UniProtKB/Swiss-Prot annotation:
Cellular compartments per GO CC: collagen-containing extracellular matrix; cytoplasm; cytosol; extracellular exosome; extracellular space; Golgi apparatus; membrane; nucleoplasm
Name of the featured protein: Serpin B9
Pfam families (UniProt xref): Serpin (PF00079)
Function: Granzyme B inhibitor.
Record gene name: SERPINB9
Key words of the record: Acetylation, Cytoplasm, Protease inhibitor, Serine protease inhibitor
Length: 376
């Protein structure tokens, strides 16, 4: 699973960078692990250049048993008896006249806990759209209701990849609501907006990353199975500078025990709620996945004997809310320890300007969610 962890982490940071570039001043939020597992499900049915492009974009070696690794990861992430609620749901919806292969359908169930649902896009496009939206709403406890907007499905649609994820976690150290107060959030040097800023002073893992001039804070959820990592540039450092130099290898190095040390720290973190949606086709083209979306070029012959089958639509919509109680969501470097700095009142982590954040499954070392908070 370590190979997959590195591959999915690399994919996560590449994906985050593309979304940040496309919207330089906007908020960003997505679930890279659910996107990569959904794509790997399509990879099961892909051959030739289509499969090569997808494997390369996902940083995967097709020779390895990647599907079994995804099976282990999804089982670990979705396991029962945790202190957090996390539900991932992938499903392919295919035109019923396409005659999908039973071997492909069985593999989807075995490795991805996902079934291929056959619908009649040709005869009942709008009913099919509503069916898909209802399924997603149910899987995300009503947080994501209109995944596919009106007229996004038509009689030409053949294959829709749907990817839903829902997360709700409580902090290991909750914030006290009585300390939450309005404070200015500096969007840039000219503009600021008010936010509800949470506050607590407690012991957390903290580091200062000299390479990018930023602080890195880890806020664990209950039982410390998952953590929120917040990467906050120093005052005067542009977040885009941090984004450009960020890699998964660096993030992994910065979060190692010799880099992050437990220290008493004042934490100021804004309450926020984000809901973002992305048409993944344009994003994935940036990553080199081109053929899968093109009729006549896509080779999905391990999925169906239909010659012109291609991926018609892949939409990713995600929701996150961070508050005093916790989070509700539905998507080799130099560093030194802040505790060693000479600060009279102890370290202070004040997230009153744009930052990157990651929700990590600690045991699997997997980035479940990542995003950028730029503006309230």
């Amino acid at each position: 699973m370590e190979t997959l962890s590195n591959a999915s982490g690399t994919f996560a940071i590449r994906l985050l960078k593309i979304l940040c570039q496309d919207n330089p001043s906007h908020n960003v939020f997505c679930s890279p692990v659910s996107i990569s597992s959904a794509l790997a499900m399509v990879l099961l049915g892909a051959k030739g250049n289509t499969a090569t492009q997808m494997a390369q974009a996902l940083s995967l070696n097709t020779e390895e048993d990647i599907h079994r690794a995804f099976q282990s990861l999804l089982t670990e992430v979705n396991k029962a008896g945790t202190q957090y609620l996390l539900r991932t749901a992938n499903r392919l919806f295919g035109e019923k006249t396409c005659q999908f292969l039973s071997t492909f359908k069985e593999s989807c169930l075995q490795f991805y806990h996902a079934e291929l649902k056959e619908l009649s896009f040709i005869r009942a496009a709008e009913e099919s759209r509503k069916h898909i939206n209802t399924w997603v709403s149910k899987k995300t406890e009503g947080k994501i209701e209109e995944l596919l907007p009106g007229s996004s499905i038509d009689a030409e649609t053949r294959l829709v990849l749907v990817n839903a994820i829902y997360f709700k976690g409580k902090w290991n150290e909750p914030f006290d609501e009585t300390y939450t107060r309005e404070m200015p959030f500096k969007i840039n040097q000219e503009e600021q907006r008010p936010v509800q800023m949470m506050y607590q002073e407690a012991t957390f893992k903290l580091a200062h990353v000299g390479e990018v001039r930023a602080q890195l804070l880890e806020l664990p959820y209950a039982r410390k199975e998952l953590s929120l990592l917040v990467l906050l540039p120093d005052d005067g450092v542009e977040l885009s500078t941090v984004e450009k130099s960020l890699t998964f290898e660096k993030l992994t190095a910065w979060t190692k025990p010799d880099c992050m040390k437990s220290t008493e720290v004042e934490v100021l973190l804004p309450k926020f709620k984000l809901q973002e949606d992305y048409d993944m086709e344009s994003v994935l083209r940036h990553l080199g996945i081109v053929d899968a979306f093109q009729q006549g070029k896509a080779d999905l012959s391990a999925m169906s004997a239909e010659r012109d089958l291609c991926l018609s639509k892949f939409v990713h919509k995600s929701f996150v809310e961070v508050n005093e109680e916790g989070t509700e969501a539905a998507a080799a470097s130099s560093c030194f320890v802040v505790a060693e700095c000479c600060m009279e009142s102890g370290p202070r982590f004040c997230a009153d300007h744009p930052f990157l954040f990651f929700i990590r499954h600690n045991r699997a070392n997997s980035i479940l969610f990542c995003g950028r908070f730029s503006s309230p």
